[in-house]
Amino acid sequence: PGPLLSSFAKELSSYLNSGMAILTAIRLIEDQHQHEKKYASFLASLRTMIEEGKSLYHALNSQSVYGMPDFFLQSINVAGQSGKMVPVLIQMGNFFSTQAKIKKQVGNAL
């Protein structure tokens, strides 16, 4: 789910960077994507677990809507422990965005 992770990471980092709480940010993203059933289900799952007091890492790791790359999960885990969530989310968003562009270019070249 590269493009999805890129979008999620960029949106979440933007809200968190503005000083918004993670739960509020997840709710806003969920409201913006309510018409996308699978993505909305993913966000609702995250929101529920975060409301229960679980970390973003735990919520991402426990949800079953999308498979998450291990390096993404571990990056989020370290970011949560070190207080560097915004820069890590920005880097992850950029990484997945670049990866999607390269994949598209390779597909077009073939």
Segment roles from a protein language model:
Residues 1-110:
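Catalytic metal-binding core of the metallo-beta-lactamase
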